[in-house]
Amino acid sequence: MKKRIITISREFGSGGRTIGRQLAERLGVHCYDKELIEKLAEQTGLAQKYIEEQGEYAPSMNRFSYAFVGRGVNGLSVSDYLWNEQRKKIQELVEKEPCVIVGRCADYILRERKDVFNIFIHAPQSERAKRIVEVYGETDTEPIKRLREKDKKRAINYKYYTEREWGRADNYHLTLDSSVFGIEGCVNLILRVLDEIKEK
């Protein structure tokens, strides 16, 4: 069966966002990453920066304590409200067109669909640390510490909303080490796999 929707989950600094954009360009479809944040900002009235930071990295506290903070929209925490709106927007987008979606727990949100192909991009910490300095520049925080903090928050967020383990192989159809294949190599491999699936 042809896979219309591709989701890209990724470790911080693995190049997953770039892979998603290049893949979408090669497929001739939209890539929803920053664009999804813009649409959510329009829909919710929340600031884009807040959505970008909270959509994948909240909650950073344990589940019990988090349940009692940040209430404000129909009795929901702002993050829970954002999750609901994000879920609805993703489901709406995939009904309209084939696309690539980066992050945002899209693999879980679309888990009931048969036309979705879920990918996880990872790489060794040393390689990711180099990349985040190249892409984002130096900060006061050591690169390894930065990526560990980001990954930890993504994992907590994913677990909180999906009750699944972030990065666990059986949540995805394909996992790739971008340090082995490179960005372009990952894109080429994904396209080959999609072609193989299409023929079955």
Where are these regions (language model features)?
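Glycine-rich phosphate-binding P-loop
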Residues: 8-21
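RNA pseudouridine synthases
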Residues: 99, 106-112
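Conserved phosphate-donor/acceptor-positioning beta-strand/loop module used by diverse small-molecule
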Residues: 112-134, 140-150
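Small-molecule kinase domains that catalyze NTP-dependent phosphoryl transfer to phosphate-bearing small molecules
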Residues: 59-67, 139-183
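ATP-dependent small-molecule kinase phosphotransfer cores
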Residues: 41-98
